[in-house]
């Protein structure tokens, strides 16, 4: 919301700088998104008196001698039609910044710096300026809309600051307001807060007016939907004289982004911005039946609004009708059939409180919004409805544009505009704050906020102003508003008074990572060194993910916690596995053209002890790794698993496993010292097809709650071997069903000198018989007591081959 400092000063004597006021607003809970001067791009502009003005032959230019007061007299060349000797105009000195305009002299194209120049042989030491070049409009300053030089007041002194004269030195606060403070959606609302912050009296806008004896006989107002319109006020104004608004009103409206239309319409917009009350004015000559009725629209009923758009309504929409037809879409926009025109002679002013939810739904459903609907959506109180009407009628008299009749109707089924009493415990207020604010200080602060407090022992009695609907007690026995009172106290007292303290139940611990955190970080570093990128997903997944991975009905993964109010259906379950998120992530990467890669995630899965929940679920820290692409395989995933094992100085073993979403022959469970910690395998082909995945994908999940037992395992130093290692590469032909792990286990059991076994090739087809495969291993033998010669190593190989043949029927490939 835009708030001009000059307008704010109308109600509060502000004796601090704009920057200091910005700080006070921030400390009081109001975020100032931007603070800027109206003429922030304009600099070094002073009043100049043209002493002589001579035409330059054969051009439209004039060469002028300009008196700029303390800045001296300078020669300036000017092409404006209205330049003349004796005239006073804005002078941009050398080095000044002004707006550059297009050829139409109206369109701003940027900011330019004035330099010394030469035109038709005449030197020019500055520039005489138009209103557009200063960023001014006709609404901001009278005469600025003229397509020529901006004329300064006759009493303006040469050398005087033009920004001060034209109001370009005014400051603007762009304030972001929270939803719980609709009372601050106006200049007066912010002024109330500034008054309390600076402890200065609030000067209320004038609301006095005189009613004549003239009446609109028989006029009546009925509200058929009081749930949607708890208050509706109408007041008749006659002998209306349509015309322009005074310059001060047009300027203020322009500063907050509203263009002047006419005096009557401008008054409604002015009250909206000043008081926060949306107003509307109907041309009485177009109201039929001498009545106004507030009702729900009929099904299919139509209205053409002020922007000449036709809308078809339903009973969900609230309309303002005369005796025959709808004349306004309540809270959103008036009807074209009753708009204020140049010929308007009498008007009916409307000030109302409409239900915020209904206005919001109507605006969304019809795709129609306005300044008024935005204000109603945030909430309007009955106090502002009454004050807004009084202020509008005062302005009618002040501007001399009409006479106020004694005909007015006020239908009220809502709250009283009188302050409502509320009592809270001072002890409870201080307990919320965690500090001891003296009772007399609380009284002082709440008095500044216009709550008229009194104290009796521990009981603080407040008179809640009607415009503070966020603080109004919800019943006679409402004693639970002390947190709201605490908020009011501390934002005025100062948040800096709250000291950092530990909660009573908090435990003080030494800094640094614990064992689990250190182990987790080491694990992540290990995966990164193997080319994997960390990713993070929501802690939720979709029921369709469980179906995608084909989990049986009784699978533990389907025993998931349902979110009561999910973001959407795809994030409606707490994750019981990380695999679904990882497989979907691989699919998304492929769709973005990333056809290979390695990803990992460390996150919690949530295993409920029972459903519906009666106690907290078991949260288990889990690692999920995903690989995909032409270079990835079951064995590269096994290499990643072995890399994790090596980093922990443990050995993983693998056994075949069946998983609903993994390839039946390329899936294993992972064991660490005989304890199952997870699984890995190739994603099943049918799942890859459903996700349109082009390359093979592999996924691994490890339970870090179990694996963390080995995070701080002490590593023992193994001395370097005294004798040279011996390596042999052997290829074996075997049944397809035999696993790599079975071969490795058999070799290690047969020979105690085997240090390392690496699988480096798998081959099928060609000379390999049907149902068979070839697996090639590199086997490393390490002597312990003496060096091995070739003959002894060959004996090892022969025994290994014999044992493999005996156990599995394996043959050494020629």
Go through the PLM ranges and name each one.
Residues 39-43, 209-213, 463, 507-508, ...:
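Beta-rich nucleic-acid/ligand-interaction surfaces
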Residues 2, 447-455, 461, 470, ...:
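A carboxyl-terminal module marker
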Residues 1-211, 348, 367, 371, ...:
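Phosphate-backbone binding interfaces of nucleic-acid-interacting proteins
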Residues 198-223, 400-429, 436, 485:
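Terminal amphipathic helices with adjacent charged low-complexity linkers/tails
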Residues 33, 47-76, 255, 262, ...:
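Conserved mixed alpha/beta core segments that line enzyme active sites in large multi-domain catalysts
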Residues 189, 422-595, 728, 780-782, ...:
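Extended, well-folded interaction surfaces typified by the phenylalanyl-tRNA synthetase beta subunit core
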Residues 5, 55-57, 198, 202-301, ...:
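Glycine/proline-enriched, intrinsically flexible loops and inter-domain linkers
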Residues 120-129, 133-135, 144-148, 163, ...:
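Mobile "lid/hinge" segments at catalytic clefts and subdomain interfaces of large enzymes
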């Amino acid at each position: 919301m835009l708030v001009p400092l000059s307008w704010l000063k109308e109600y509060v004597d502000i004796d601090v700088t704009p920057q200091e006021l910005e700080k006070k607003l921030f400390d009081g809970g109001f975020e100032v998104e931007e603070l800027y001067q109206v003429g922030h791009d304009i600099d070094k502009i002073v009043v100049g008196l043209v002493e002589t003005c001579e035409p330059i032959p054969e051009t439209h230019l004039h060469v002028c001698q300009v008196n700029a007061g303390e800045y001296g007299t300078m020669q300036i060349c000017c092409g404006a039609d209205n330049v003349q000797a004796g005239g006073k105009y804005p002078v941009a000195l050398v080095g000044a910044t002004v707006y550059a305009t297009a050829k139409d002299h109206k369109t701003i194209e940027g900011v330019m710096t004035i330099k010394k120049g030469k035109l038709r042989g005449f030197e020019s030491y500055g520039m005489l300026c138009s209103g557009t070049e200063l960023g001014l409009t006709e609404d901001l300053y009278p005469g600025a809309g003229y397509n020529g030089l901006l004329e300064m007041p006759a009493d303006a002194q040469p050398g005087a600051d033009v920004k001060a004269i034209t109001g370009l030195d005014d400051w603007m606060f762009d304030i972001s307001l929270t939803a719980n403070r609709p009372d601050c959606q106006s200049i007066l609302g912010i002024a109330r807060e500034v008054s309390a912050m600076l402890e200065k009296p609030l000067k209320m806008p004038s609301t006095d007016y005189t009613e004549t004896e003239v009446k609109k006989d028989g006029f009546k107002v009925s509200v058929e939907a009081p749930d949607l319109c708890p208050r509706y006020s109408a007041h008749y104004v006659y002998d209306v004289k349509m015309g322009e608004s005074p310059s001060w009103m047009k300027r203020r409206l322009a500063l907050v982004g509203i263009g002047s239309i006419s005096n009557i319409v401008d008054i409604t917009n002015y009250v909206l911005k000043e008081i926060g009350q949306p107003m509307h004015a109907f041309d009485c000559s177009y109201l039929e039946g001498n009545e106004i009725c507030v009702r729900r629209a009929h099904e299919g009923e139509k209205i053409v609004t002020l922007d000449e758009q036709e809308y078809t309504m339903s009973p969900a929409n609230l309309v303002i009708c005369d005796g025959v037809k709808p004349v306004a879409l309540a809270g959103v926009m008036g009807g074209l059939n009753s708009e204020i025109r140049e010929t308007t002679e009498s008007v009916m002013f409307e000030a109302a409180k409409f239900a915020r939810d209904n206005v919001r739904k109507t605006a969304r459903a019809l795709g129609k919004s306005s300044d008024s609907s935005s204000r109603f959506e945030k909430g309007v109180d009955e106090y502002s409805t009454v004050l807004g009407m009084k202020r509008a009628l005062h302005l009618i008299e002040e501007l001399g544009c009409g006479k106020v009749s004694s005909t007015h109707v006020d239908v009220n089924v809502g709250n009283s505009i009188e302050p409502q009493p509320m009592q809270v415990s001072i002890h409870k207020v201080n307990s919320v704050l965690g500090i001891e604010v003296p009772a007399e200080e609380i009284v002082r602060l709440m008095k500044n906020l216009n709550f008229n407090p009194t104290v009796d022992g521990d009981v603080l009695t407040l008179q809640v102003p009607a415009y503070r609907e966020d603080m109004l007690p919800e019943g006679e026995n409402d004693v639970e508003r002390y947190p709201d009172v605490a908020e009011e106290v501390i934002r005025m007292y100062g948040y800096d008074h709250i000291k950092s303290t530990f909660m009573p139940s908090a435990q003080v611990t030494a800094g640094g990572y614990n064992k689990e955190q250190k182990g987790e970080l080491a694990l992540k570093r290990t995966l990164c060194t193997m080319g994997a990128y960390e990713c993070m997903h929501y802690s939720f997944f979709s029921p369709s993910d469980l179906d995608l991975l084909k989990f049986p009905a009784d699978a533990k993964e389907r025993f998931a916690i349902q979110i009561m109010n999910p973001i959407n259906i795809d994030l409606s379950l707490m994750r019981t596995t990380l695999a679904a998120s990882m497989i979907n992530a691989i699919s998304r990467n492929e769709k973005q053209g990333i056809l290979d890669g390695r990803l990992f995630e460390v996150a919690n899965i949530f295993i409920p002890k029972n459903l519906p929940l009666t106690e907290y679920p078991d949260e288990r820290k889990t690692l999920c790794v995903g690989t995909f692409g032409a270079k990835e395989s079951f064995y590269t995933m096994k290499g990643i698993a072995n890399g994790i094992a090596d980093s922990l100085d443990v050995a993983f073993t693998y056994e075949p496993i069946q998983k609903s979403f993994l390839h039946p022959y390329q899936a294993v469970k992972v064991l660490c010292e005989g304890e199952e910690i997870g699984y890995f395998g190739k994603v099943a082909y049918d799942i890859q097809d459903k996700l349109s995945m082009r390359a093979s994908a592999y996924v691994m999940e490890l339970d870090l709650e179990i694996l963390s037992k080995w995070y701080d395992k002490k590593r023992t130093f193994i001395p370097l071997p005294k004798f040279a290692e011996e390596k042999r590469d052997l290829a074996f032909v075997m049944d397809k069903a035999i696993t790599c792990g079975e071969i490795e286990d058999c070799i290690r059991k047969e020979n105690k000198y085997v240090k390392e076994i690496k699988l480096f090739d798998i081959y099928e087809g060609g000379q390999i018989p049907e149902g068979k495969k070839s697996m090639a291993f590199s086997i490393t033998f390490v002597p312990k007591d003496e060096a091995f010669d070739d003959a002894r190593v060959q004996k090892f190989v022969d025994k290994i081959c014999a044992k493999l043949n005996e156990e599995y029927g394996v043959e050494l490939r020629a």
